[in-house]
Design a protein with these regions (language model features):
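Conserved NAD(P)H cofactor-binding loop of Rossmann-fold oxidoreductase domains
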Residues: 89-94
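Conserved glycine-rich cofactor-binding loop
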Residues: 13-15
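Active-site helix of classical SDR
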Residues: 121, 159
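Substrate-binding pocket helix/loop in short-chain dehydrogenase/reductase
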Residues: 97-99, 105-110
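C-terminal helical subdomain
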Residues: 183, 204-241
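Conserved glycine-rich Rossmann-like NAD(P)H-binding loop of the short-chain dehydrogenase/reductase
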Residues: 27-44
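Residue(s) in the substrate-gating loop at a strand-loop-helix junction
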Residues: 141
Length: 266
């Protein structure tokens, strides 16, 4: 092991979180994994320790449960783990139109992608202030720059925009205290997330030139976070789209989004 520092990664059992664990471990960081699937976490922790000669621990938690952030933080404190990097990566999808979703599902969606991020971030910001430094990776989305799309995207984009603003607020308020937050905003990334959430047909419809490999996304995200970058968007096309969304007049952007969603905006 190169050091005694740990990286805490939520949503670590698959997809981007799985690759992030490998990227950090390959750089000598010890890892704390958390997700809902104990079998996958156990297998991944063994794999990381064997391959990279680091320490890897895991705590099973469902971030749709409002008590989960406190339980995860308590686990780290009880095991005296020096967490120097927090990765807010856990995901949640709703494969239904907005008018068809039930309140329980919406509550879980908002808790996983919003409330749990706030609570985990606050717990570890307090620790980072004591230790004098810390880094936070906010795994957001390219969707955070654009107006909400149709279906599940009506909620997804706005929540990810909130995550970005929270990351910005961390930098504004705590950068002078040694704490940085990096908003990682990938576009279409090839993972098992879309299959598991019943949206593989939507992913298949995306042109291949718009898709990014999950390993390259994870590698770039880790490098950006370690450098303390405020925002990182992978790939030229995604960067260009993010730029357009930032400079295009809001009314025009909404009209274009409405057309793409099959609707109209007058």
């Amino acid at each position: 092991m190169k050091n005694s520092e740990y990286v805490l990664i939520t949503g670590a059992s698959a997809g981007i979180g799985y690759e992030l664990a490998h990227q950090f471990a390959s750089r000598g960081y010890n890892i704390v994994l958390t997700a809902r699937r104990s079998d996958r976490l156990s297998q991944l922790s063994d794999e990381l320790m064997s391959k990279f000669n680091i320490d890897a621990k895991y705590v099973t938690a469902d971030l749709a449960n409002t008590e989960a952030p406190m339980e995860i933080h308590s686990f780290c404190k009880e095991h005296n783990l020096d967490v120097s990097i927090l990765v807010n990566n856990a995901g949640y999808s709703i494969n239904k139109k907005f008018q068809d979703t039930d309140e329980e599902t919406e509550e879980k969606f908002l808790t996983v992608l919003g409330t749990s991020v706030v609570h985990l971030t606050k717990y570890f910001v307090k620790d980072f202030l004591v230790r004098g430094s810390g880094k936070i990776m906010m795994v957001s989305s390219l969707a955070s720059f654009a107006p909400p799309s149709s279906g599940w995207g009506m909620m997804y984009g706005p929540v990810k925009t909130f995550v970005n603003r929270l990351g910005d607020a961390i930098n504004i308020n705590y950068n002078s205290r040694g704490i940085t937050a990096t908003n990682v905003c990938p576009g279409f990334t090839i993972t098992e997330f879309h299959t598991a959430s019943g949206m593989q047909d939507k992913m298949d419809a995306v042109p291949s030139f718009m898709k990014k490999d999950v390993k390259s996304v994870a590698r770039g995200a880790v490098e950006a976070t370690l450098k303390g970058k405020q925002v990182w968007v992978p790939g030229f096309l995604n960067k260009f789209l993010a730029f357009l969304c930032n400079v295009m007049p809001a009314r025009l952007l909404i009209k274009i989004s409405a057309r793409l969603a099959g609707g109209r905006y007058e």
